[in-house]
């Protein structure tokens, strides 16, 4: 009995220490990341943001549009096409896929660190997964017409280039595909491995962009590793640095005079995590040991990022070593999500994730950056081993929480860390998947206001690039989520239809201003849809605990627009939602509620009988 009592005391002590540690961690997180701020935007003015008034050493503030080879190019036999085509076709393969799906449970902790999404294991708690066949590698691809055509940007770049030009943007961000230029491993020398016709074709596209009055921002690595490199381990191996430099030299030597700025790597830590830690992207199928040790100092995560950092530094030096009258701008596009804990005991996962993803890669290359590119899409509420679908928050079709304040906070945070280097920023990607186009318009305006507010606070930002021009292939989500300013009809020769957001974006770009009128029109339309209970597509599966699955959906679920004020400077952050935090919050707030419920009567008065009436207590349940 005494032993049992001792165990109870020890358990109670451990629970108290655990709760206390999490409370301290969350308090620190809240001070650093959730502190309230006063918006520097004067909302009483007709012009809320005037980007024309801002100049820097490189010239005026610029607007741009972005695309990438894997999203847009046809006639491309890359890793993504091969990955999409891999599907179980027999009972044996289906059974093997089921076993593999069950094994994904081991990766849940990694999922919380990487993207907070649990892999769909078709378990009993999945309210959407009854009798589903094994998941495909790429959702909404096999059921999409002419899936391999993507946007035909390789054979017909004119459509995308003209659409971009007509908005008035001055920067066109695109990429060159490594596997197209080097379709085979250069074991027998560069000359035999390079497709020089592809090099010339890329030059032809770049010339088209420039002839349409736009500067070129060229990305060298955008989530697409050549299949031959994946076969030997890809970025886990040092020799990939040498091969990447062979590729870089070919591109730079051939296209240097046609390119104005360079992005060596797009979101390197995202590629590393989803490829080498989760195995949910093409290029690797990690085993248990690799997963379990992935975030250790010598684990696959740090190892792959190390070689990508070495590759960036070498590419930076090579580009700057070219003799030219113009000074090149070389940087990376770094993905940053605003992550917050859903409950008190989720602060650990958020802290670990942030420690791995926010600063380490940029820290390792910060001495060799002419700009820091920020890719920002929204916020993520971490809950246990996944991301929570918070019913009171608005989301994109891809499951990203809409949170413009996060861009403001991220820019200030990065500026504070790197201001001693005097490195400017570029928002290299920002956008939202929204087929209805009702969310996209206020999303665009509010994020531009967040960006402008950061600039008013002293953050040097050279430009803003929106993702993307036309609806395209969205990685493992296929053709489900719609990110484009332009809709694409895949059943009718990829016919384009301009969305209203296209015209709004063009108006802002050409005027350089965000007006109060445009903000009100966009926001009021969203509010009208929300109050009417209108539905929109959503391409994430959700379990009975409202945790989102990483797997995309072939066909969307339907979710109502959310009636919540997420405009820049207006968003009210929810408190922690776990049971313990709710109880504690209630206990703390209860005395305040009671005080407010007391009827305060400053002047005594009497009834008809002359008796003194004192203030009465009102029931807190009134």
Swiss-Prot record:
Residues 1-3 are stromal. Induction: Not induced by cold, dehydration, salt or abscisic acid. It is an enzyme of class 2 (transferase). The chain crosses the membrane at residues 4-24. It is a single-pass type II membrane protein. One of its GO terms (biological process) is response to freezing. A beta-D-glucoside binds at residues 222, 266-267, 377, 429, 467, 474-475, 483. Expressed in hypocotyls, cotyledons, stems, leaves, pedicels, sepals, anthers and pistils. Limited expression in roots. Not detected in petals or filaments. This is Galactolipid galactosyltransferase SFR2, chloroplastic. The gene is SFR2.
């Amino acid at each position: 009995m005494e032993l049992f009592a001792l165990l109870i005391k020890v358990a109670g002590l451990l629970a108290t220490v655990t709760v206390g540690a999490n409370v301290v961690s969350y308090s620190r997180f809240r001070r650093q990341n959730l502190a309230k701020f006063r918006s520097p935007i004067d909302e009483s003015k007709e012009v809320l943001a005037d980007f024309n008034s801002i100049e820097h050493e490189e010239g005026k503030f610029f607007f741009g549009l972005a695309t990438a080879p894997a999203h847009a190019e046809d006639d491309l036999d890359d890793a993504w096409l091969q990955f999409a085509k891999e599907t179980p076709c027999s009972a044996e393969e289906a059974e093997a896929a089921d076993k593999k799906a069950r094994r994904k449970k081991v990766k849940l902790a990694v999922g919380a660190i990487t993207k907070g999404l649990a892999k769909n294991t078709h378990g009993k708690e999945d309210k959407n997964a009854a009798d589903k066949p094994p998941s495909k590698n790429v959702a909404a691809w096999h059921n999409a017409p002419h899936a391999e055509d993507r946007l035909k940007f390789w054979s017909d770049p004119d459509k995308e280039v003209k659409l971009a030009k007509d908005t008035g943007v001055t920067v066109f961000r695109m990429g060159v595909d490594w596997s197209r230029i080097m379709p085979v491993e250069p074991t027998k020398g560069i000359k035999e491995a390079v497709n020089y016709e592809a090099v010339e074709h890329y030059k032809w596209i770049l010339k088209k962009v420039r002839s349409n009055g736009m500067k070129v921002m060229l990305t060298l690595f955008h989530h697409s590793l050549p299949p031959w490199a994946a076969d030997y381990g890809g970025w886990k191996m040092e020799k990939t640095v040498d091969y990447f430099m062979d590729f870089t030299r070919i591109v730079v030597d051939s296209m240097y005079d046609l390119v104005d700025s360079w992005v060596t790597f797009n979101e390197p830590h995202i590629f590393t995590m989803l490829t080498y830690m989760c195995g949910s992207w093409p290029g690797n199928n990690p085993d248990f040991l690799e997963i379990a040790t992935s975030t250790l100092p010598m684990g696959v995560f740090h190892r792959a990022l190390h070689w990508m950092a070495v590759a960036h530094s070498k590419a930076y030096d090579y580009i700057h070593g070219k003799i030219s009258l113009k000074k090149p701008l070389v940087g990376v596009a770094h993905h940053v999500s605003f992550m917050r804990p859903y409950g008190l005991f989720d602060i650990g996962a958020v802290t670990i994730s942030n420690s791995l993803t926010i600063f380490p890669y940029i820290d390792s290359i910060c001495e060799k950056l002419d700009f820091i590119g920020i890719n920002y899409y929204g916020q993520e509420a971490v809950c246990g081993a996944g991301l929570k679908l918070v019913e009171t928050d608005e989301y994109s079709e891809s499951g990203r929480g809409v949170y413009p304040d996060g861009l403001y906070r991220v820019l200030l945070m990065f500026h504070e860390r790197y201001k001693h280097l005097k490195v400017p920023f570029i928002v290299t990607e920002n956008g939202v998947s929204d087929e209805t186009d009702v969310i996209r318009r206020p999303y665009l305006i509010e994020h531009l206001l967040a960006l402008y507010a950061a600039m008013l606070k002293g953050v040097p930002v050279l430009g803003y690039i929106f993702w993307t021009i036309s609806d395209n292939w969205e990685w493992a989500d296929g053709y489900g989520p719609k990110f484009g300013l332009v809709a694409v009809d895949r059943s009718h020769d990829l016919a384009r239809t301009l969305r209203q957001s296209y015209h709004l974006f063009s108006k802002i770009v050409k005027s350089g201003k965000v007006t109060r009128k445009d903000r009100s029109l966009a926001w009021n339309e969203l509010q009208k849809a929300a109050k009417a209970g209108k539905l929109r597509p959503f391409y994430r599966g959700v379990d009975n605990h409202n945790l989102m699955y990483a797997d995309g959906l072939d066909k969307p679920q339907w979710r109502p627009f959310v009636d919540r004020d997420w405009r820049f400077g207006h968003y009210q952050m929810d408190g922690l939602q776990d049971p313990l935090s709710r109880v504690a919050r209630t206990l703390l707030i209860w005395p305040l509620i009671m005080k407010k419920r007391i009827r305060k009567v400053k002047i005594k008065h009497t009834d008809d009988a002359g008796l003194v009436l004192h203030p009465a207590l009102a029931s807190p349940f009134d």
